[in-house]
C-alpha cells in the first residue's frame, strides 16, 4: 500500500450528515502529522437524458442556490446518501424525482468520483438516467423550493463547461461521462 498509517482519529463536530474529525497519521519515514477530515456518507448524481425525434440528446439540469458560495449553481440532480443502507441507484432515482420531477426508466452506473480527496472521504456515484417521464414531486427545503429545472441539449451543456457556466465537479464529471457513454453507444 502507501506506507502511510492512521494512528488516531477523534470527532471534533458531529453534524446532521457530516462529521468533522481530526486525525493523526504516520508517514513511511516515521514522521507524524495531523489532518482535519470531513467524514461523509457520500452522494449520488444523476444525468437524466432525453432524446428528441432526431435522436439528439438533451440533459436535465437544476439551477439552485448554494449557501457556501452564496450563489446559484447549475448542477445535475444529486443528493446525499443520507438513508442508511439505501442503494446508490435508488438514491439516484429518488433525487431525480425530488429535484427534477422525473422518474427514470433505466439508470446506468457511469462511475465514481472523489470530489475533494484532500479534505473529505466522500465518494460521489454518477448515474445516467434514460426513459424519463414526468411525475408529481415534493421539493425538500428552501433551496429546492426555488430550484429551476433546465432542459439543455447535451452539446450546449458541454459548451457551458467550456465557458464556465457549469463548474460543479460532479456535474462536469457526469456530463463528460455521459457524452463518452453516448458516443460509445453510437460508435462515434
List PLM regions with ranges.
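Conserved Nudix-box catalytic region and its N-terminal flanking loop in Nudix hydrolases
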Residues: 38, 55-94, 136, 143
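Acidic, metal-coordinating catalytic segment for phosphate/diphosphate chemistry
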Residues: 9-47
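Nudix hydrolase/Nudix homology domain
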Residues: 4-6, 72, 109, 117-120, ...
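Active-site-adjacent beta-strand/loop module that shapes the phosphate/pyrophosphate-binding cleft
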Residues: 21-29, 116-136
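Extended interaction-bearing regions that mediate binding to partners or small molecules
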Residues: 1-11
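Internal catalytic-core helix/loop-beta-alpha segment
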Residues: 83-111
